[in-house]
């Protein structure tokens, strides 16, 4: 059986942030569930289509450049992470459940 931190340990840290993912793993989660959007050539981790609920930004995730998205506060000073950054902090045996919200140019 797997125990997944939904959007990380989102009850204790800002959801879908590196802090939430790291905390979930310290709380004996087997892995994490996260949500992804493609923006430019990167995969970013955020749940909502709109930035307003989880960041100090406004508008749709996919209507902004990466530089703007990375400048936002996703809670407690956390930034919107890239998927590659999540791979860097998770243990090699962690389970990863990825919910694809938006991808463009998929071959």
Roles of regions detected by a PLM:
Residues 1-107:
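Phosphate-group recognition and catalysis centered on beta-loop-alpha active-site segments
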């Amino acid at each position: 059986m797997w125990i997944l931190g939904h959007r990380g340990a989102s009850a204790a840290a800002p959801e879908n942030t590196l802090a939430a993912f790291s905390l979930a793993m310290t709380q004996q989660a087997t892995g994490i569930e996260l949500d992804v959007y493609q923006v430019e050539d990167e995969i970013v981790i955020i749940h909502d289509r709109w930035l307003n609920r989880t960041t100090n930004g406004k508008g749709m995730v996919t209507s902004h450049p990466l530089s703007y998205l990375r400048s936002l506060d996703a809670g407690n000073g956390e930034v919107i992470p890239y998927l590659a950054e999540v791979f860097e902090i998770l243990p090699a045996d962690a389970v990863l459940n990825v919910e694809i919200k938006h991808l463009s140019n998929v071959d």
